[in-house]
């Protein structure tokens, strides 16, 4: 019975099923051939039909089941009736079998803030770089990201017709992260992943100071954190404003649950309470291992230019 499970684990189990449905919606929009692209603030800040439908699906599905939640989504959508086909009311039973970490067992619905990025890597989505795309649902308590779900709609899309398309990664602090194979980047190598479409001199200066062996430029914050946990990159460095709370909330949980660290460029933890400003104005610095190496190499000039 649902009542025997904690609010947090019921929410995570529901968000998992909702994220899977979101992945299906993302694939359907591509298959139909009309992305419905709208330019928001610039040529690199885009919104598609998938962004709109997925946000409606996630936010409405969560709000129906958990009416006291605070839900903050990336897209500014007009209120209105949501098509019943977009509603997902299932929950992933495997998650309900897991124990809730004791520090979260008494959390109430109204204590939680959910940060939603319906399509992280929208620009890449419009350009056919489908492996960059993720759906992000992050859950915060007392300003801290404590649970997260990442759906990769096109995971395996280049692995041949017999490969299962898409996957969902999830994690809860104090419990762990699941749905992927943890792998560390090669020891002694500094492989840095950073922005593909929002670079500037600060970003370049910060990365150069870290003596990188390789620099990967890819889309999506969720995608970059997946690179860290799967050993494709050693650090994620973005010394610039631009990234928002819905970009980092879910990925941060997955990284922290396996022993990594994500902060702003100054080393401060990011805050996720409902009143906080949405922009991560002091950038992002993350690593699975050896975080201190990267933090110690951030130039003072870069820190001085980025005010938290």
Swiss-Prot record:
InterPro entries: CysQ/Inositol_MonoPase (IPR050725), Inositol_monoP_metal-BS (IPR020583), Inositol_monophosphatase-like (IPR000760), Inositol_monophosphatase_CS (IPR020550)
Binding site for Mg(2+) 3: 74
PTM-bearing positions, type Phosphothreonine: 122
Entry comment describing in which tissues the protein is expressed: Widely expressed. Highly expressed in kidney.
Modified residues (Phosphoserine): 240
Modified positions (N6-succinyllysine) in chain numbering: 244
UniProt KW keywords: Acetylation, Hydrolase, Lithium, Magnesium, Metal-binding, Phosphoprotein
pH dependence (record): Optimum pH is approximately 7.5.
Cofactor note: Binds 3 Mg(2+) ions per subunit.
Catalytic site: 51, 122
One example of a Gene Ontology biological process annotation: phosphatidylinositol phosphate biosynthetic process
Protein name, entry field: 3'(2'),5'-bisphosphate nucleotidase 1
The organism of origin for this protein: Mus musculus
